[in-house]
Structures are given as C-alpha cells and as structure tokens.
Amino acid sequence: MKMMKVMMLIVMMMMVMVMVSEGSIIEPTCKETPDFNLCVSLLNSDPRGSSADTSGLALILIDKIKGLATKTLNEINGLYKKRPELKRALDECSRRYKTILNADVPEAIEAISKGVPKFGEDGVIDAGVEASVCQGGFNGSSPLTSLTKSMQKISNVTRAIFYSNSIVKEEACGSSWPSLALNIDSKACVVSLQNIQFNRGRTCW
C-alpha cells in the first residue's frame, strides 16, 4: 500500500515536471512570425494563451482578427455620418470587412477544428488583402489607416502560425495530406478528412 502511494506520488511529480518543462509555447512560436512583439502581446492578452498548443494560439489570433474586423465595421458605420463624402470608399470597406467576418474567419476556424491548418491559410491571408483593398479605396489619407494596418499586421502574424502548425501536422501525420483520408492514427494525429467541405465550396484536395 505504501509502495502504491509512493508510485502515485512519483507519477504526479513527473506530470508536473512535464507541464513545467513544456510551459508556454508563445515565445518560441512567435519567433517564427514577422512581428515577435505584436505576436507575444496579442497572445499574452488572452488567458488561453499560456496553456494553448499551436492550434490554440492560431484560434486566439483568429479571434483577434474577428474582433478587429468588428471594430472596424463599427468605425465605418460611424464615418457614414461624419464623412458622407467618403461614402463610396466606405461602402467598399464595409464589403471587405464583412467578407473577413463572414468568409475568412469561419474558413480559418473550420480548418483548425478539422485539424488541417494548411487549408485555413487562405482565409488568414485574405483578411490582410481585404484590409489593403479597403485602404486603397481612399484617395489620399484615410480615417481607417490605423485599423487597416493593424489588420495587415495581425494577418501576417497569424499566417505564420498557421504555416508553423501545418508543418507540425505534416511531421506528425505524414507529408502527403491526401493520405490523411485513410484515417491515419499517430500520437499527434487522429483525423478523418473524407469529404471535408470548406465554406467557400473548397475541398481538401
């Protein structure tokens, strides 16, 4: 009985040591992105960040993109009253940011939830593109410059993490993504990808 208690204590200590040794992966992950400081700041601002894996970090950043897009749309709606002469440019920006919310963000979330981050990169990249197009619709200065630049930066950071996550998945599951349809089961990958449909009508392959 005493030996059993000792064994249980040892197991518990080993589990704690593993948790401590692993720690947060925020900093090493952010080193793979184009803006380390922004990446760390965004991820540390969310309580989920300290215990999240790479997929979890990607989801946090997708939430940041969603939040910023929502904030920008609210700003656009306010500008219709303050700057009516900018209506055409604001209409374009409104369409672009609605695309981010209604297409890009859901696409990226679905890719993560299905365990195929590689196929979420397009949505993340497109969020930055939509912001750039919005900015380009203004002749000269834009009241949305700060927000559009922030979206571009967050998009670039998120894309890097999606790419990093894709590499991890490929190393765990095999480099040939179509082979995952065979229900490969490994220590880091238990997935079934048959007939996965993404929200723009795409399939995995």
Curated annotation (Swiss-Prot):
The keyword Glycoprotein applies. CDD domains: CIF_like. Disulfide bonds join C30-C39, C93-C134. It is found in: Vacuole. Keywords: Disulfide bond, Glycoprotein, Signal, Vacuole. GO terms for biological process: negative regulation of catalytic activity. Disruption phenotype: Increased vacuolar invertase activity leading to accumulation of hexose. It comes from the Eukaryota. GO terms for cellular component: vacuole. Belongs to the PMEI family. Inhibits fructosidases from vacuoles (vacuolar invertase VI). PANTHER family: PECTINESTERASE INHIBITOR-LIKE, PUTATIVE-RELATED. This is Cell wall / vacuolar inhibitor of fructosidase 1. It comes from Arabidopsis thaliana.
